[in-house]
Amino acid sequence: MSTFQESRRERHQRLKQRRRRKWTAALAMGAAALLFSAGILLHAMDGPRQDQGEQAAAAPYGAPPTLGKARGNGAMGPLPPVYGPTAGANAAADGPIRLVFAGDALMDWSVKETIRKQGPDYPFAHVAEEIQEADFAVVNLETAVTFHNQKDTNQLFNFKSDPISLEGLKNAGFDLVSIANNHTLDFKQKGFLDTLANLEHYELPFMGGGKNGEEAYRAHEVTIKGKRIKFLAFSRFIPQTYWFAADDRPGIAEAYNKSSVLPVIRKESQDCDYLFVYMHWGVEKNNKPEPWQRTYAREMIDAGADGIVGSHVHVLQGFEWYNGKPIAYSIGNFLFPNYVKGKNADTGLLTLTIEDDGIRMSFSPYQIYRDQIIKKDAAYVKRQFKYLESISYDVAIGADRAIEAIQSKPPASGKH
């Protein structure tokens, strides 16, 4: 007897179509209600009709319809329903588990305008298929998601994205976002709480931040193909200490103090099969990690992490293996406005594949171009692999995109 099994990509397409039908139905019902109300109002009016000289500004593409009053947390509602997580939708009872990680996603500036014109799926049109082929996918949300306007004036740049941009991340195939970075509080606690509310609305789980310290340092756990897998996120680049999550304060999980990180890893790793850490760290534009980062990564693995993935520096950095565990020091920008050029525009998807005999690491190069993540030709991919090998630590990248550990070369004779 044959058994039909819906793939993760097919499920994403089906849910996206269902969301669109819900939006259309909700807007149609709203329009009908407005017409009905307008008819009653016109019947009831005794005085002259109001002059229509004032025109309301057109709402940006995807702005949530005002079908109700704004909630106290700043998110608009009620909104059309969004359907739930897709993790493991194509998972059999056994077999390899493919985890995909992407770098910093910023849907402000030119990306915001492009989404308003082209829709939230446009930036991910060329990369979504690979994301959806994974069993679980993670991205760093490098922006507040809010309509709140009061900036944190201590920031050089303040980023905020429209809530509809989260639909693009969801439709692309992401199952989890890290909010542990130096931009999710760009519009203060109000904007941060809006961000959490909007993520909850789009049913995009988050890690690395929260309404209090307990939530910020909590691991996100999923079960895929019978394996319990946890994810943690921390930031070691936070503009102000008042961004740190505390018992009674919303904020970010900080990594300046190892005592904030290593005990959490030890605790969370006790009752799961695998634990992965997403770190926001490093010196911007540097193509290699600082020595302290290499030490820190090893300490996190010694504490119980099964892999470390980094972001923040806006460029790709190299890879390393430590005790059979993968380290990717920076996977770069993932989606950034169209001012990014050269190495700032080089991006890709990191895949960690869990197999019976260990974890495999591979990387698929892409490029940011005019507010999209695009595929490149074989020559570009070959150049990227050669470059990434040159800045990595004792790895070789094969034609199959696998990143393998190689034995260090012994020192030359007579030198120590």
Question: How would you name each of these model-derived features?
Answer:
Residues 2-16, 21-416:
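Acidic, metal/ion-coordinating pockets
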